[in-house]
Amino acid sequence: MRGQSLLTWVLAAAVTCAQAQDVPPWTEDCRKSTYPPSGPTYRGPVPWHTINLDLPPYKRWHELLAQKAPALRILVNSITSLVNTFVPSGKLMKMVDQKLPGMIGSLPDPFGEEMRGIADVTGIPLGEIISFNIFYELFTMCTSIITEDEKGHLLHGRNMDFGIFLGWNINNNTWVVTEELKPLTVNLDFQRNNKTVFKATSFVGYVGMLTGFKPGLFSLSLNERFSINGGYLGILEWMFGRKDAQWVGFITRSVLENTTSYEEAKNTLTKTKIMAPVYFILGGKKSGEGCVITRERKESLDVYELDPKHGRWYVVQTNYDRWKNTLFIDDRRTPAKKCLNHTTQKNLSFATIYDVLSTKPVLNKLTVFTTLMDVTKGQFESHLRDCPDPCIGW
């Protein structure tokens, strides 16, 4: 009986969200004049921190964690509570704490040692830090956009939507984990020899990267891709000893840190075996250098590129293959395209991209931050977001 009630609630919620996708107040006309960020959809700036790559991996995050450890403990405790709600025996978390630390040596450098350093400084068990990093392989719902204006200038924008089904606060209509991630959101300037190697926006405690750019070379964001051959299978294979695939957040960071051109980045992201199916959204600095790479775990299915000579002056990627319809209760693609077409190619700027990313349901209850990247000018900025009621849950 309880199962029937839950199913009825889920179906009712789905129908409500499906209807809300198409009608105000959960959708709206394309926003204008939202930039510079202000007002009720703007939570505040994302703080900057430097990560010194010349330090041993174990020590790189210590200075940042001295400030952010309490907030990280709150988030990890929330995730643990959610897991224990579904597995009340506590056996799953016991396995996490007992089994995962033994696998730290199988992680590629420098990620294992960085996680070990994070665990020691925060006092959070190493197994939970590892699971916290796995967690980002599975729950990333995002919108990414690359545009090219009439002069061939490229811009890259993204909304980071995270935390779906990870605890709903009925008192203020927010996702628990989404809200707890906002104090942990940081801009990171990764430096070597006191010079910037790359910049990224990420969450404290996570050593992979999901959003970043290499000034003057390329920009990169990652969106989750739903597939039957999904990330859970990749994680299980890794836990049972198969180590031939890379974690998606690790390969993104590795490309940002080590790759020296747009074409090299595209080649790596297209061919490397990965643990979870994803979309890599990659932008460069020259006309036509922008693409969405649709990945299965072991192969690339599609590389969809800018083609301004034939009228394709933007690419938009949410969490669905471009050749398929979106899920009927989650269509962010259509309003994003509508607003870009309304903007027109001649009016592209940080301001107009931010307007698109501020329009419901592209902006929704899962949106943690918005990032804007200009590779050519070396501009990178991120802003914490809110979506006050009435606002769709995803």
Swiss-Prot record:
Q: Which residues are glycosylated?
A: N172, N194, N258, N341, N347
Entry-linked Gene3D superfamilies: Penicillin V Acylase, Chain A
Gene inactivation phenotype reads: Lethal for homozygous knockout embryos. Heterozygous knockout mice are viable, grow normally and do not present overt clinical phenotype. However, they progressively develop lipid storage-associated phenotypes, with an elevation of ceramides levels and an accumulation of lipid-laden inclusions in liver, more specifically in Kupffer cells, and other tissues. Associated with the accumulation of ceramides, a depression-like phenotype is observed for heterozygous knockout mice.
> Post-translational modification, briefly?
N-glycosylated. Proteolytically cleaved into two chains alpha and beta that remain associated via a disulfide bond. Cleavage gives rise to a conformation change that activates the enzyme. The same catalytic Cys residue mediates the autoproteolytic cleavage and subsequent hydrolysis of lipid substrates. The beta chain may undergo an additional C-terminal processing.
Its annotated pathway reads: Lipid metabolism; sphingolipid metabolism
Q: Name one GO cellular component term.
A: nucleus
Q: Please, one GO biological process term? A: sphingosine biosynthetic process
Annotated compartments = Lysosome; Secreted
Enzyme Commission number(s) of this protein: 3.5.1.23, 3.5.1.-
The record's disulfide annotation reads C30-C339, C387-C391
Any GO molecular function? N-acylsphingosine amidohydrolase activity
Question: Which domain of life does the UniProt lineage start with?
Answer: Eukaryota
Which sites are catalytic? Answer: C142 (nucleophile)
Question: How would you summarize the oligomeric state and partners of this protein?
Answer: Heterodimer; disulfide-linked. The heterodimer is composed of the disulfide-linked alpha and beta chains produced by autocatalytic cleavage of the precursor.
Q: Which family does it belong to?
A: Belongs to the acid ceramidase family.
* Record-given protein name: Acid ceramidase
Record the organism: Mus musculus
